Amino acid sequence: MYKRQIFDNKAMGFSYTRINNPTIEAFEKRITKLEEGFSSVACSSGMAAIFNSIANIVRQGDEVVASCGLYGGTVELFEDLESFGITVKYVADNKPECFEELITDKTRVVFAETIGNPKLDVTDIKAVADVAHAHGIPLIVDNTVSTPYLIQPITLGADVVVNSSSKYINGSSDAISGILTFNGKFKFDKEKYPGLKPYLKFGPMAYIIKLRNGLFRNTGGCLSPQNAFLNNLGLETLGLRMERHCSNAYELARYLDTFEGITVNYPGLESSPYHEVADKQFTKGYGAIITFRVGSKERAFKIINALKIPNIVSNIGDTKTLVIHPASTIALHLSDKDKEASGVYDDLIRVSVGIEDIDDLKEDFRAVLESTDNE
């Protein structure tokens, strides 16, 4: 029977929506092409995509080397991994040599973000990929903040790319979703990755087939077809939106940088310690997230509450400008040490810049910053 061949991985087809689905596949194929990858698996959220990408190839006793400044949710996920006997080590700095220092014979994954959130640190993907590959280890990169519009990590050496497609890919905050994309080129050593050994006969599809027929299927972290449909709609305007997002963010960052009493962090500013790497990797913009410190937690709250255009929301990537106080929201449960490593401070405000008229945004921030200047 043809259906049996599908279940036995001897024929292509759809077996069950928890594993695959035509609408979801259409979304996966689009992302695969945008990321210049080989194959993708869409998940219920960005966190599910990160978990599946790593858990597919690690087991108890293995180690993960991760970049500093990771998104708080990812840090908390990695704490959960440690409860399964998987050790996560964080580099002190995202320089390639810092990754090299932490890699041991137990390391099975190197993990990084193209742009950290909210630290906004930028990883040199090619340099870190070279370090990982020298040890026979895949590099997994979270491309959520950049999107494939700004950078395609696979072309720089990344082996797996994850996106929280709830953000810029969707663009309207109407669907929680995530997706991982494999390059189809990384050669997994059967001794180092014994869980993949039975699947190596599938060649470049080994990583994906193992995932679909194991962890992904059995944990139920699949994307709903409706959310895949909404993401497909979002993809149709991704390029236009990202162009406006990035130009607005660059202009707003430069404008905010003229105010005394605040410190602006944005990779597009020459004052950013990551500007040189960002300039090398990004050709169409520096992303659409800005953070700035205002001197005190009290002033940060006053500014956030007084702004008229932005919504106070913990999400990023919406067409609308969004502001949040990370220390009391998305990073609330992190330790003080982890907050500092993630670039989170009590007086920090994060802005996900939308596609509104830039002059309107400037005027809104000007009025609020000036009114709170002496408070």
Predicted regions, residues:
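Conserved PLP-enzyme active-site core in the AAT-like
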Residues: S40-F259, N265
